[in-house]
Amino acid sequence: MATKFPSFSQGLAQDPTTRRIWYGIATAHDFESHDGMTEERLYQKLFSTHFGHLAIIGLWVSGNLFHIAWQGNFEQWVADPLHVRPIAHAIWDPHFGQGAIDAFTQAGASSPVNIAYSGLYHWFYTIGMKTNAELYQGSIFMMILSAWALFAGWLHLQPKFRPSLAWFKNAESRLNHHLAVLFGFSSIAWTGHLVHVAIPEARGQHVGWDNFLNVLPHPAGLGPFFTGNWGVYAENPDSLNQVFGSSEGAGTAILTFLGGFHPQTEALWLTDIAHHHLAIGCIFVIAGHMYRTNFGIGHSIKEILETHNPPKGTPGDLGAGHKGLYDTINNSLHFQLGLALASLGVVTSLVAQHMYSMPSYAFIAKDYTTQAALYTHHQYIAIALMCGAFAHGAIFFIRDYDPEANKDNVLARMLEHKEAIISHLSWVSLFLGFHTLGLYVHNDVVVAFGTPEKQILVEPVFAQFVQAASGKAMYGMDVLLSNASSSASLAAQNIPGEHYWLDAINGNTDVFLPIGPGDFLVHHAIALGLHTTTLILVKGALDARGSKLMPDKKDFGYSFPCDGPGRGGTCDISAWDAFYLAVFWALNTVGWLTFYWHWKHLAIWSGNVAQFNESSTYLMGWFRDYLWLNSSQLINGYNPFGSNNLAVWAWMFLFGHLVWATGFMFLISWRGYWQELIETIVWAHQRSPIANMMGYRDKPVALSIVQARVVGLAHFTVGYVLTYAAFLIASTSGKFG
């Protein structure tokens, strides 16, 4: 007898309605809730999924390498990276006639192709790849790695090779492995690749499988390393007129601290990058050995936390400090996942900021569309990770938190202070919202009445002070690094080696861009969005176990619609609802953030910074001079007279709006509407001559309120992303290629 889906839940499998299908999909990855699940089995399943995840990443990398080698123009691009557009892949079946075929036959190709805005060409080139053959080799290597990861995932599900629960709960050994081996050694290994392959290639010396054993990365060899004379490796760096990829102007240094950028590539010096990875690797190898594993030396994290008690009798007694935290964190996968997601979210946002302001890949700074795409991509990923962090924090409080084990410690005291925390966030959000919007609207009104001189324009003097302290001279503040005789400047001059940082910060680069009143306003708009998103997420987590309105909330789980009639006000207050609302605010915030970044850069790249500076101080300026003005080219990607190479983005722009608007159908009309509609459709089917031949194995029932919301949210999010992605890429590539 065939068992119905889902096999992991007999309760759901026996449900006679379509709820079986939807709840089955919704809980497929909630391993904790599956029938017969033990804690050990849960850890083993999750451990194996990590290998599956690695395999997917490997296949994705392999596919990119393969398609660029097969259908791209990598070798032509390497010969002239500033003028050749990189090709992502061919278009097999171009629609819409000869005009479209002609429009997409671009970048020197003989048939229709897509342009790459991923930055992969720049990355491959920077790390020492120059031929299609090398790309193919990389692709095959990643494919083998993926197959190995899939095998490892399967293997660790077999009875003989399943790790025990004690192995998973050994936090010190896991930290040792992750910090020292995965993070530390891989950073040092990457330094090795940069020193042995990438830096020689950047100086015109090819290093391959045929000669890597007899090409010395440094003329002095390992002598200076063993004699402690490490400074030799920083001597004779590349000169300012070095031609990347050739020996012209090349030095011999491999580990430097030059600062600033290579003048030709406008990217960080490869020798600086190698030095950075070596330092990071050494730090992490040391960090990984701080904790006590099998050898009885080093710290016990539990002992540190148990001992870490605040002094008694201080103003505002701090209770039991960190007592109980070790077991709480070590026994809760949701707590650990929340910490990991929050950390990764912050790092991803930092990656977005650093990729444009201090680019590490050769010539990527001049590929404007790629810069815009990568910044936006990483900020969107960051908000998704951060929302996930708070979601799992809330699930921790519902499923894993033990009030007895955490009595009076920092976690318990945070819950006790939740009213103060939530009300402060509320106050900050209200303050930022009213003041920022008030300034924008005031400026809108006076501009509309023809008196722009009456705008309230605030110079961001504190931010300008930070820029000046870091060496930006244009503000005339003469502080720290922007004052040649200050203690900071004198100390910097005494550090051996070249110093190109001041040239970078005062040159035509993206480090510390000049800022004014428009930046001040949008900075506070973004701050409003961040604080409101945080308010909703923090409130959702802190109230997840219960509130004055619903003290027994934890008994209802993470997501519930309401507690039925007779208990008014219990709708929309589950921890899941907080996550749901926060995602809208997160999208709102990342929208403002990416609008700001993109418009400011469009103005810089086109040599018309006045447009941003003058129009960004009132809302109509944003709507008219950023959104409307930059969508005109995009909307004309195709029209009655034909199409150009923006046609695909024009279509995606429309399609994104459609998906986004569909979200509202689910967000506004609730369960009763859908139930009535479904019953009407079932009635019509049963009375139609052909449709009545189809029977219903499950009785059709409408989505629950929570499900309708998640479907609406998914459409809203996907539509929002598709719409802005199309706008961003088309408006940038339409101007700059």
From Swiss-Prot:
InterPro entries in alphabetical order: PSI_PsaA/B (IPR001280), PSI_PsaA/B_CS (IPR020586), PSI_PsaA/B_sf (IPR036408), PSI_PsaB (IPR006244)
Residues reported in the UniProt entry to bind chlorophyll a B3: M665, Y673
Keywords per UniProt: 4Fe-4S, Chlorophyll, Chromophore, Electron transport, Iron, Iron-sulfur, Magnesium, Membrane, Metal-binding, Oxidoreductase, Photosynthesis, Photosystem I, Thylakoid, Transmembrane, Transmembrane helix, Transport
UniProt cofactor note: PSI electron transfer chain: 5 chlorophyll a, 1 chlorophyll a', 2 phylloquinones and 3 4Fe-4S clusters. PSI core antenna: 90 chlorophyll a, 22 carotenoids, 3 phospholipids and 1 galactolipid. P700 is a chlorophyll a/chlorophyll a' dimer, A0 is one or more chlorophyll a, A1 is one or both phylloquinones and FX is a shared 4Fe-4S iron-sulfur center.
Residues involved in phylloquinone binding: W674
Family per similarity comment: Belongs to the PsaA/PsaB family.
Listed name of the protein: Photosystem I P700 chlorophyll a apoprotein A2
Organism listed in the record: Synechococcus sp. (strain CC9605)
Record gene name: psaB
